[in-house]
Amino acid sequence: ESAGLMPHRRYWGQLDRATFAFGYGLMVTPLQLAHVYATIGGFGIARPLSITRIDPPVMGTRVMPESIVHSVEHMMESVALPGGGGTKAAVRDYRVAVKTGTAKKIGPDGKYIDKYVAYTAGVAPASRPQFALVVVMNDPSNGSYYGGAVSAPVFSQIMGDVLRLENVMPDGMPQGAENLIVMHDSHPQGPAL
């Protein structure tokens, strides 16, 4: 895995701070980005990265104040709501907290070219995050290239399928509607062999 690129804070100038604010000037892999979102979903507690469930859960280290993480997650949740830039990332009956993004690619001469990377990253369900997901689309070619248009629908489909397959209780339904849900036990007689 690539180490990514995040210059040390002591070397940040005004231009660095400005470009970091909209996602330029640093490089991370999708896995590293998913780890950051898992930390946000863990309310500021960083745990070792794992693709599969670790049982019992591993203790983590607090890396962000919980109050700040709740504020960030609340802002991210508004992205998938009507009026937000990532409404196509919404998952029916679930609250999701997402961030969409679009970056111009750099050509061999070091200048920006008319090719893009679109991404959508987030956690769900927003009320008690259990899953973090990052969808990256390299040089989308269907006419649109914004994260909110091309990667957000893929995020919605994957996250929705994961939440339903894992029998995660919906958190975006009106009060009392949970009685209308039929949950299926995926392992009625123990795990399948």
Please give the residue ranges for each predicted region.
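Beta-lactam-recognizing serine transpeptidase/beta-lactamase-like catalytic domain environment
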Residues: 1-137, 147, 190-193
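A short acidic/glycine-rich loop-to-helix N-cap element
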Residues: 140-150
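Short, gly/Ser/Thr-rich active-site loops of penicillin-recognizing serine hydrolases
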Residues: 57-60, 149-193
